[in-house]
Amino acid sequence: GNKEVSDIKILNLLSDCEEKLNIKAGVELCQNALINSPIMIGFFRPSIILPAKELGSKELSYIFAHELIHYKRRDMFYKWLIEIAACVHWFNPFVYLLGKEVNRTCELSCDEAVVLILGDKTKREYGDMLISFVRADNQYKSSLASVTLTEGAEQLKERLGAIMELKKKSKSIKV
């Protein structure tokens, strides 16, 4: 099960990231030994769930920025809508294609925002972190109703290409 994070350094990193992104409501932070990649779950009470492995402060900053951008953009709401549509229209393959496209778009957009917020110099480290999470095999497979940092090799390849091609557009960004 999930174990609440009590490490003050990690909680301060999360708080700093929430402040940087102007997020008022706190997001719960937990760890789970059964996952190898961070994930955000919950719609009314969102939680970021970290793998139980040791993560450095840079990695945690990237993870928190990524997951909090999903939270701020309400990506969970859109994923839940797709999940509900899939329940009602379970026989329609286009609903599943739409779900994959929504997930892909959310991740690419989120990666872009992370790099723009954290700076151009973080592209390589952020990409390396994504690769490390894809290499780890999760016991829990993600669903459309969750937001994860990684999905698979093909999507990772597309995400890394987009991250590396990203040019600094302007100093102001609306998240």
Predicted segments — roles?
Residues 1-175:
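Membrane-embedded and juxtamembrane structural elements of multi-pass membrane proteins
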